[in-house]
Amino acid sequence: MKNISEQKRKERGMTQQQLAAALGVSRQTIISLENGKYNPSILLAHAIARLFGTQIEDIFLFEEEEA
C-alpha cells in the first residue's frame, strides 16, 4: 500500500525515531512503512493520521489488486 507518511513526517520536521516514539512503534516499523513494505493495522493507521491532523485516506493510498 502506498502512503505519504514520509512526506508528512518531513513536513513536520520529525525524524523516523521521533515518529516511532510518538506512535509507540520501532524505527524499523517506520522505515518499512515509508518503503511500502509494511501495511499498518487500522489502529496504527488511525494514530498516524491523527498525529498528522488528517484522515487515513489522505495518508494511505489504497490500490486494488488486479485479478
Regions flagged by a language model, labelled:
Residues 3-22:
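Short basic helix-loop element that most often maps to the first helix and adjoining turn
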Residues 61-67:
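Short, charged recognition helix plus adjacent turn
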Residues 18, 29, 58:
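Residues in the helix-turn-helix
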Residues 25-38:
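Recognition helix of helix-turn-helix/homeodomain-like DNA-binding domains
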Residues 8, 42-43, 56:
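Short, Lys/Arg-enriched C-terminal cap helix and immediately downstream tail that follows
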Residues 45-49, 59:
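Hydrophobic micro-packing sites on short alpha-helices
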